[in-house]
A protein has these predicted regions:
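Short, structured coil segments at secondary-structure junctions
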Residues: 55, 121-123, 176-177
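Short, structured patches in soluble enzyme cores that scaffold and shape functional sites
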Residues: 33, 104, 128-130, 155
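Iron-sulfur-cluster electron-transfer modules
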Residues: 1-119, 136
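Conserved active-site and cofactor/substrate-binding residues in soluble primary-metabolism enzymes
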Residues: 43, 83, 128-131, 164, ...
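Redox cofactor-anchoring modules in respiratory/redox and cofactor-processing assemblies
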Residues: 138-180
Length: 180
């Protein structure tokens, strides 16, 4: 991993119930945290799994997730990146994964664009966690605690510019009763 000790990758998840529920379940959807949430913004990783759990999302997590390989690709090490991508894709296919949910914009870009660029079609759908939450909340807004606040939201570059996901984060905040 580019961010730390591979053995510490799951340190963000100390909730034994959530860990037991999602670790290596038989879902064909993988919540792929990525290096940044797993090592650097651990509350983001934990919040993601809590929200998806609360919304009844069907997914699994794995302990030996590894890095998506985006940095190898972006620094021009395409042969090494391709090997990395192939190993990850093999792992996903062996687990029967058909969909990846990722909270990391770097992983999103890598799985959605870099993997197909080097490997062709992967047969795995890739979705940012914001999209997943938005889709789940459209029909479950009653689960949210309403806040009566004005909020300023700054779009994450890759999510807004590459994916054009501008309305989804704002709608989620509006579902919570916020004015954006």
């Amino acid at each position: 991993s580019v961010s730390g000790d591979p053995l510490a990758r799951m340190d963000w998840l100390d909730d034994k119930d959530l860990k037991q529920k999602y670790l290596d379940s038989d879902s064909d959807t993988l919540l792929y945290m990525g290096c940044i949430p797993s090592y650097l913004v651990k509350d983001s990783a934990y919040s993601t799994i809590q929200v998806l759990d609360k919304l009844g999302c069907d997914f699994r997590i794995i302990e030996d997730e590894g890095c998506c390989g985006t940095y190898l690709y972006e620094c021009g090490k395409t042969n090494t990146a391709k090997d990395y991508f192939e190993k990850n894709l093999e792992k996903f296919k062996a687990l029967g994964i058909k969909k990846l949910i990722v909270p990391c914009n770097g992983c999103l870009k890598c799985f959605k664009y870099f993997y197909p660029a080097l490997l062709g079609k992967t047969g795995i759908e890739v979705e940012h966690a914001v999209e997943t939450v938005f889709n789940l909340l459209e029909h479950q807004q009653d689960l949210l605690k309403k806040v009566n606040q004005n909020i300023t939201f700054q779009d994450p570059c890759r999510l807004a510019r590459t994916e054009n996901k501008i309305k989804e984060p704002r709608k989620i905040l509006e579902y919570c009763g916020a004015s954006v």
